[in-house]
Amino acid sequence: MMMCSNFFMYLAARGQGKTFLTALFCVVRCILFPKTKICVASATRTQANEVLLKITDDFMKNYGWGSDNLRREITYTSVGANKAVIEFANGSWIKVVTASDSGRGSRANILLIDEFRMVDLDTINTVLRRFLTAPRQPNYLNNPKYAHLLERNKELYMSSAWYKSHWSFDKAKAYTVNLLDETKKYFICGLPYQISIKENLL
């Protein structure tokens, strides 16, 4: 659904695959859609780095020939406190941005906010969402026959659930309403914490 939706929200407790699934989406998207720009943000850079570390320390090392193939697609990686970026041979990249006023100026086709409930709503609306200016410009748009097939930018929100009094609950309700509207490409998924307990993940 991350591929199909322009607005995606995943609410789940610890151990339910938020980081794994989003990192996997980022890799697949960057490989299949050249020159994709993905910005990852969270309340702290350490938390945002987890998505990139899942790629560099897990996907690129622990899956045999699959990891070999992935390493061939990636030309550069750097995941540190001040700089975190993964660059692909086809011009795509994933980088971590600061979720504050100092993070202004970045540009992206996909905005991924991990643990979004911990990020200030004003920062999301006035800084992070402003990254999504121009959509990806694939070469097929140069052909008049396909010039109308513009891609939409994407927003992805991941978090554990929080109090109903918090603004994130209102955002989740809005996503639920829009999910039911067939003219809009919204998706929201909420998994109960009991799943983590049953599988001994909490």
What are these regions (language model features)?
Residues M1-L202:
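Phosphate/NTP-binding elements of NTP-utilizing enzymes
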